[in-house]
């Protein structure tokens, strides 16, 4: 398994950003905590001020220009990146000029920052930068994709076989940029499906498969037998009925069925998902996959059974018995419920039902299954009793299952009941879920109840319920402000300014919370803290010593290398939590076949965290197989949860902080299933 996985994309391709960093490290060899990197002295206090600026999301134009004019190479590169991180649109002209900077690290970060800004005024400059060294062209191509439609002509021109860059990595980035266009320029992508580079073929296939571009499906048929498993996986995805439609269904079904028997489990997973979109014609392959030797393939098949099986109970019982694993059976339970088949494990009145087991995960699974029920009546029958469960994680699952229906006309009779229990729950996330589910039809007469819930949430260590309540107030004000009682308006305006910026940001769009906007934003931390990050995290990494960490699981050990220059605050946060034992004796609470393995929640249901949030540190690292990212519930909501990529997913680039990569333990990553135990994480 390890040898086979070593041939995956992460090993076939060295990330241009990673290569750029490697060469930059070589050029800057000799760093020490004295603040000198090679012959270029790093001004530690000034670098610390830059970190503080980015952390506070403030644009300090004077500081940026000072660093760009007289700073060391690492400082200048970081300053260019920070402009994009703080959404410094006023400095877009500065970034465009930096595309010609003689330091390729600066120019490359400038290109990436223009992408974060989606700078339409920079299209010509970015297109010109495609002729720059690969380090720069790599991010210029990505940035053009972020700009989107205004960059279409530039992307199509750059992909013409007679003018395309020679570097296969830059070609790859150009192709990946096109999947963000609607429609995808298939004519420009098509020639690269036959390229000699597996990376280029994969990128071209991804550009068609990710957005389900129907115009390119026929062109992918020859690639169903490609030598690269990564390419075949994208072909399997593209053969979904969503892309192929009825007109090409007969043409792709045979190769798709063959891909469901592919030696690579990642390919089989995508093939099974696509076959399920055809309904009954895909039944045999999907059902057969429930007995696949790979656990993740079995789980993926179980998740799709609702698309291929009807409500014949015997077929569902057969599927249930195919595997005894928790995640497999949970998936069968949910799929069966979508066909209004209530398996014994979900029978609320049965004493042996999962709803009555001591393991909270089993009870939560029943609540989750209720959310898939085709009728409100069935949903209430299954999930509502579990909304009174003694465990907040089960109650949270129950309210989450009911949440999509709480704002509909059909659910109106029990909306008030939902508010009565959910808004008073002692658990912060139950309250957050309940409030969030009601936001769409927020009314003035409901604000007092939510205001009472907000006051309860002021004592929470987590901000979720406070933020949800503020969003409810804003929604109600926009929909129904004329019916707000004067006393309610006065009470809302008298609320203390929240300490957490997430709640303040949520209120930014209405005059009701004008005082919050005027309130000063304190520096997140003292300057000495940021300077210490520079000395202890950034300078050693610039000198070539990247921090490492090990995730010791029940299936083996995963070894990580952390990007302390690209995401210093995130890396420091992760290593600090690990040193405190925060990640000891927990489980992977979310594992999605062929996507991610996620951990970092001691609560265990995906809703927990360390009682604080950290800012995003978006950077040019890409989401390849083995990349490590910070999990979010929205911008700047990171904390302790992280995820490991089981396959490359470029659509995540620029949306979540990449702060590390795997350098060992590939077979462990492939074997993980949801619920697997983590003994400990330790950094070095």
Task: Describe the predicted segments one by one.
Residues 63-71, 94-102, 125-133, 157-163, ...:
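Alpha-solenoid HEAT/Armadillo-like helical repeat scaffolds in large eukaryotic proteins
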Residues 63-66, 78, 82, 94-97, ...:
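Residue-level detector of alpha-helical secondary structure
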Residues 20-26:
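Sec-dependent N-terminal signal peptides
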Residues 427-429, 445-684:
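Cyclophilin-like peptidyl-prolyl cis-trans isomerases
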Residues 60-61, 92, 123, 152, ...:
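Core helices of alpha-solenoid repeat scaffolds
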Residues 37-58, 74-88, 97, 105-119, ...:
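Structural detector for internal amphipathic alpha-helices that build alpha-solenoid repeat scaffolds
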Residues 2-20:
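Bacterial N-terminal signal peptides that target proteins for export
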